[in-house]
Amino acid sequence: MIKLTAQQIFDKLLDEEKILSANGQIRFFLGDVDIIVKQKDVVGNIIQEWLGGWLRKREIEFDVSTNTQMPPDFFLNKKDRSRELLEVKAFNRNACPGFDIADFKMYSDESFISPISGCRLFNIGYDMDDNGNVTIKDLWLKKVWQITRSMDGWAINFKSKKAWCIKSARVFGTA
């Protein structure tokens, strides 16, 4: 197993794997039915799962978080889980990023006792056509503070439904 940083993985995906020119599809098999998934709302989770498979196939050291509701998605340093944390955020490139960065209370509480505030965000802008073909259009590696913005009366942008969630800014140059 080789140990890579988030930046090295980012560079490898862009430079060696040429991820921005790769094409894919999401297929589902159940019984004797085989379909190509054409619903965009599942693509982000599938891309995250694919990244884990890619890391495994390349024999890159990582652990997956057991708590899917808290960052990070991946620990890139198995011996020191306070360093090299990676969270995947994928969004439809033809729309505004609609993902929540984090639940504010969880994020503020955890920032005092663990290093999630230093987590790198792997931001993936994808496109899916009407035939279910998926392409990665853009890839960014950012820190939380690099993709947030302020809002009226607050230092950070929130949305409130059931909880206060930190929202991303339009830093990705989407349409």
UniProtKB/Swiss-Prot annotation:
Listed GO biological process terms: DNA restriction-modification system
First-level EC class: hydrolase
Catalyzed chemical reaction(s): Endonucleolytic cleavage of DNA to give specific double-stranded fragments with terminal 5'-phosphates
Function comment: A P subtype restriction enzyme that recognizes the double-stranded sequence 5'-GGNNCC-3'; the cleavage site is unknown.
EC number: 3.1.21.4
Keywords tagged on the record: Endonuclease, Hydrolase, Nuclease, Restriction system
Descriptive protein name: Type II restriction enzyme NgoBV
UniProt keyword Hydrolase, yes or no: yes
GO molecular function, a single term: type II site-specific deoxyribonuclease activity
Superkingdom of origin: Bacteria
Keyword Nuclease: yes
Native organism: Neisseria gonorrhoeae
